[in-house]
């Protein structure tokens, strides 16, 4: 059995489908109970487990051959740094000592040490903890998810404006989450000798102006980029419902991302899904 954490999101669902299509039994860990009728429909088994319930999670891992680990995002209304580190700690504790064939960990471009830099610091700690397990480990570091732009579609349609933290002419690596999940699923099934960090981005890099151009075609009206200056990032996050702690952490993460304070991989895996094809799924 292959266990998939986060299997109801874009990445986890694609990973689960990749493994299922290859003929393996798949159990997806969810926060809520999934109806039996839905389980029969997609062929996947579902286990409603709170990832902070370390003992129950370990019991599930003990029945598995291989595990895909995706740390669930915490509610931005709380302290995301604290809550996401709690789940990382629980997941790693549940994995420790379990005789698994292989573990694949979902991470991000720019993962680096840091207390208050959002996913960059949290997922770096997850990477380090996983690599300390006595198990073959693959780490998938993904570029900026194209799906992050989906939330802007309705506003672009209504106002003709794309608000963003990203400068309009600066190029950023981006990737469709479905391509990330497909790679994760392939690595989960690959030989145990295949380990280490695997970077993935899309077929091209894009600017926020490229995103606006695609949105223009999708919503049928001109869309202009409106850049939020760095001195207003914290305020913008707070206005979107983030707690003080989460807003500061995300603002710090955004700064590291925009100013590219990380090493770009020289030879990443290239997903096949373009910006426009991916955004059409959410339009």
Regions found by a protein language model. Give the residues of each.
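Aromatic "clamp/platform" in nucleotide-sugar-dependent glycosyltransferases that forms part
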Residues: 83-88
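Short secondary-structure boundary segments
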Residues: 71, 107, 260
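Oxidoreductase cofactor-interface core, primarily capturing Rossmann-like NAD(P)-dependent enzymes
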Residues: 2-36, 41, 52-55, 62, ...
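A hydrophobic C-terminal alpha-helical subdomain
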Residues: 18, 230-283
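Cofactor-binding loops of NAD(P)H-dependent oxidoreductases
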Residues: 49
């Amino acid at each position: 059995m292959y266990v998939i954490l986060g299997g109801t999101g874009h990445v986890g669902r694609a990973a689960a489908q990749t493994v299922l299509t290859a003929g393996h039994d798949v159990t997806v860990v969810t926060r809520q109970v999934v109806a039996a009728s839905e389980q029969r429909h997609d062929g996947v088994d579902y286990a409603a487990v709170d990832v902070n319930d370390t003992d129950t999670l370990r019991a599930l891992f003990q029945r598995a051959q291989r595990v895909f680990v995706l740390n669930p995002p915490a509610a931005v209304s709380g302290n995301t740094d604290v809550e996401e580190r709690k789940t990382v700690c629980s997941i790693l504790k549940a994995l420790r000592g379990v005789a698994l064939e292989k573990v694949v960990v979902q991470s991000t471009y720019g993962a680096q040490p840091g207390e208050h830099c959002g996913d960059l610091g949290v997922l770096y700690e997850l990477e380090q903890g996983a690599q300390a397990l006595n198990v073959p480990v693959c780490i998938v570091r993904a570029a900026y998810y194209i799906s992050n732009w989906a939330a802007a579609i309705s506003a672009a349609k209504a106002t003709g404006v794309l608000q963003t933290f990203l400068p309009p002419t600066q190029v950023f690596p981006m990737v469709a989450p479905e391509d990330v999940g497909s790679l994760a699923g392939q690595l989960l099934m690959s030989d145990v000798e295949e380990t280490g960090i695997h970077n993935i981005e899309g077929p091209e890099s894009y600017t926020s102006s490229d995103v606006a151009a695609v949105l223009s075609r999708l919503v049928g009206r001109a869309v202009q980029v409106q850049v939020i200056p760095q001195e207003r990032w914290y305020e913008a996050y707070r206005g979107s419902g983030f707690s003080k702690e989460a807003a500061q952490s995300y603002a710090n993460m955004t700064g590291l991302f925009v100013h590219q304070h990380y090493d770009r991989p020289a030879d990443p895996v290239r997903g096949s899904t373009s910006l426009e094809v991916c955004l059409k799924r959410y339009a």
